[in-house]
């Protein structure tokens, strides 16, 4: 196989929810990752909300919870803006909101969560300051981190939730980082904090006076918040910078955004976060430093960040400590895209079998700290000094539900009465006794050409024991695909 196709398959595994053979061809034919990214930015953005409303219209009275899941599947499996979707998903893992919060427990609010994600889609290739601005004025975030209707006066201090998480989780992290991602230490060897409690208290005063738009009911979540309340107009000092008195809420927010974008640690923090989510959980210092330099020189351009991550010499490096464990949502969506799973004509929405049994449905984390933290790792000597946070979403219950999803998927292969089907090329090769072709198909479509020789021989040995390619072929091919989808080599990304 041409090395360009191998590299393209690995790149798509990193920066999309899984590439089909057509996607791989598009990347190779573009001539470079830079050209391909530029082409991707021109593809119109998907809309989770639009798909949600289509499902609600096409199959009414099923409940917003089901539309929420089915419309996500429609968007990610059928959408063409594959890079934009993955970058927006990564942003959603950074700027966390969740339907699990009591404020959003009502199913009627699911559509507004879709709309929040659409905002991240719109800003996926923008400047990082635009992302901060969108999130900071989002009514979903205002409700989730409780700073909507925030007030400040002599008797009541403003709510500090958003101010704290904006610094701690979204932009700077709790400690300052060197340009290579390592923690900065003072002369005594202690970690240097990125901010103080006083910074949080002063920043909370900035986020006063923001309210929902003047509409009754849930439609208040449909538009950005407005500075219609009593904004704290007093002098403030944040991260060593003086904010003069008498500044409006909008202008003060802009000043805060610029202050954050001038913090060196922000570029390192965001760079490392994106490398962790897209390429490897344990990047080398040089990788972080090089990407961070490009991101900083671009003044926070997201497109530059993505290109720098994907074109760096470490992006396709091999070794025992490179790569990452992929989360179940990414793995399952990759399987559906790679196997070219499609709805049959006349099927109006993805069936309930894709209601995401596992607990990693987007915008559904148990808290603002997401499902895991970047430095989480299994308690095992093999991980000494390494991190692997995604292991936290592979508990026994999750693995069981993950298996159920794949069982539901492959149970419908090539059955005319079912609602979806997959690419016929795999079955054609199988029925023709083209065992090498079958394994090549799995290697190309599922493993990004990274299937080990041991796994390859295992699949060939299985096929050699399947002499009856007619009477039991459905069961035999389903067993083969199920084995591949549940294999560690498919779930991990090297």
Locate the predicted segments by residue.
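N-terminal mature-domain "stem" immediately C-terminal to a signal peptide or N-terminal signal-anchor/transmembrane
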Residues: 1-46
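Flexible, low-complexity segments enriched for small/polar residues
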Residues: 2-3, 9-16, 57, 95, ...
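Active-site substrate-binding loop specific to GH73 endo-beta-N-acetylglucosaminidase modules
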Residues: 24-29, 38-43, 49-56, 61, ...
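Amphipathic interfacial helices
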Residues: 67-68, 78-86
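Tryptophan-centered motif/residue detector
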Residues: 71-74, 162, 210, 365, ...
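Aromatic-acidic/polar surface patches that form glycan- and anion
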Residues: 80, 193, 473
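Short, contiguous, well-structured surface segments enriched in hydrophobic/aromatic residues
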Residues: 81-84, 95-101
